[in-house]
Structure formats: structure tokens, C-alpha cells
Amino acid sequence: MDIRREVLRNVTLCQALEPLGQKPGLTSRAEDASPGTKLEYFVIAGVNSAWAFYDLADRVLAAGRQPDCIFDLAYEAQAASVRGRLGGKVNYGQINLLTPLVTAQVLIFLEAGTTSDVEAILARTPEVLRHTTERDVESLERFIHLGYDLSARQHERMGRPKPLQRPHLQGRYASVWEAAQDFLHVHAVAEYTQGYPYCRRIYRFLLHNLEIGMLPASELIYRFLLPEVGRADVLADMISVGLYLVLTRHPETVLFP
């Protein structure tokens, strides 16, 4: 198995598939999408950004350990995501969640030669964050600021300029883990510092409901978790990660009969 190609495939698929499910409370992107959330924006962003995750897997393999920096590739993924489209930072949250997850996955592949143990991958992510560096903190800040820039441009195009408060991390924290402790109110940060509890629940639900189909199952878990999570866009990002985990667990299974 070429883990780099598997990562590329699954990152592409999970981001392209997630918006195909019908989710009440979230724009039906195929029918009544707002100017910033057209279905094609999500598909294009997912395809464009996936190659950075191929590079991330390749970097971990080449180093034989966790590299000195991984979040620069989150920045590269977000920068690439806008090629050929308008819209805002439509897959920002997915990139943020997938970066430490893919790193953990490839590290486990180096150690065990397999990627089928999803629970081990999820459990490894806090350790990945603890082993990040000041270079990661700098890159994470650039990634966050780029997301703010993309959002601001979209608001300007829509005639609704919106002032944004940009967090500043560089020079204040020695690792992404350390920085995360001051931002646990952010859904994605709480998720990846705690081993992805919501993504795990979504993954398990999808896994146990494969007979009804991945997309119908994703619609059901969305309805179930939305009152608890409270934000439709955040939950959509988590569902994308859940899809990624099922694709990782079942690389050869027919999941879309």
C-alpha cells in the first residue's frame, strides 16, 4: 500500500462527499446555496487541497518520525483550495482537523505497517500536537490568518464587509498543543486536543449503518448531533472527518453500492 496515495484519495473523497448529504439547518448546496457555499466550491476546494496531504504523508515517511513542521502544509492546503473558484474558506475546518489526524495515521503506518486501527489513530493525535514546534505555531498562525483573509474577501464581494479579530500565536507558544489550551472554546481545537470525540462518534455511527449507505447515514447523524454541537458548519467538518475514517478503515469495501 502506498499510504501517500491512500491519504490523497481519502482526503479528496471525504471533502467532496460531505456536502452531498441533505442536512436541515445547513445550506442545501445543490439547490439553494448562498453565494459563498455553492456545491462546486466544496468539490473544487477538496480536490485542490488534497495534494498538500499527499505531501504531508510523504514528509512523515521521509523523516521516519514526526517532522519539525506539519502545519505549513495546512497553510498550503488552504492556499491551494481557492484555485479556480470564488467563495470563502469552505474547507478550512476540515483541513484543520485532518492535519494532525493524517500525521498520526502515517506515524502509526511507519510503526505497524497498517492504517486500519482507527481508534489508535484518534488516540495518537494529542501526542502529535504535543510534539509540534514553534515552526508549527508560526505556520498555524499563517493558516488561520489566510482563512480570515479568504472570509473577508468573500464578505467584500457580497457587499457586507466584516471586521475580524485575528489571533496572534507566534512568539507566545512553544507548540500547537500549548497554544490550543487557550482556545479550547473553538470547536476544532477542543476536538483534536481530546482525541476527536465527536468525529469518533460519527465514525462509529457510519460504520454501524453502512447498509443504508454512507450519505444517508451522515444525514441521520447530522440530525442527531446538531442540537448538541450547536453549529451546522462545524458538524459538517466533523462528518467529513468521520467519512475519512470509514474510508481509511475500509479501503477496498464497496461503500457506495
Identify what each model region corresponds to.
Residues 1-68, 106-229, 246-257:
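Phosphate-rich cofactor/ligand-interacting catalytic cores and adjacent structured alpha/beta frameworks
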Residues 68-86, 226-229:
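Short, hydrophobic/aliphatic alpha-helical segments
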Residues 72-76, 92, 119-123:
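Alpha-helical scaffolds flanking conserved acidic
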Residues 76, 80, 100-104, 124:
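Generic beta-strand or strand-like secondary-structure segments
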Residues 81-88, 92, 105-112:
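Amphipathic alpha-helical interaction segments
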Residues 86-100, 229-244:
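Conserved phosphate/anionic-ligand binding catalytic regions in large, soluble enzymes, centered on
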